Amino acid sequence: MGIDPHIIRAWLTARSLARGLPAPIADRGALRVDTQSDGEIQRWVFAEVNAQLRELGCSLDTPGYLLKLCGSASDLRAALPLAWQLHAPAYFMAGPCTAARQPLPPGYTAALTQNGPVVQVRLTTAAGELVASGFAAETEHAFIYDRIVTDPAHRRRGLGRAMMSLLGQAKQKRTAPELLVVTPDGRALYERLGWQTISPYSTASIPDARPPG
């Protein structure tokens, strides 16, 4: 069994808000987002491996489509034809919802921009150099964090903790679950902040064999 599909829908709906994408719709036993962006046409997010995932993998034979699974990379690999290639691993995580506020380290300034349910935080040095940024979005069912990025030269200084704290202060519904998807490096940080991994998050696509240009 995969994770609760309602959690996936809540996260994916808020993620679409954060990125200005269409809301997810139910399709083939999964949730589909019609991204229609450079390099990506559509993506499907499955809660578990099922017959529809296998059938979809066999029916698609061109680049531009992403199949995502709240499950292991090995399970996704086994469900798809050989033309599909796995992406770098990621993890679906849930936050503590009651995290203590974290101060911004000396020498940095935060700027917060709110656009309806979406908030962006940018951290800069005294010289005005952008060194970290992140987004959050809130719906009735979830508060999600998205695109949390810190310049490698400024890591291990508490910027990640401060970023999450600043974004989290925009949350209105205190009981809503806090969700995000992270890389293995990010997972270690969030575990120290009290987050828990609820599932691996695996991705596959068919690579574009055309030469660039």
Features from the language model and the residues they span:
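C-terminal "cap" of GNAT-fold acetyltransferases
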Residues: 89-99, 181-184, 200-213
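Acyltransferase donor/substrate-recognition loop-hinge adjacent to the catalytic core
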Residues: 80-120, 125
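A conserved beta-strand-loop-helix scaffold within acyl/acetyltransferase catalytic domains
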Residues: 113-151
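N-terminal charged segments
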Residues: 1-77
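A short helix-loop-beta-strand connector motif used in the catalytic cores of GNAT acetyltransferases and
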Residues: 24-31, 38-43, 88-89, 113-121, ...
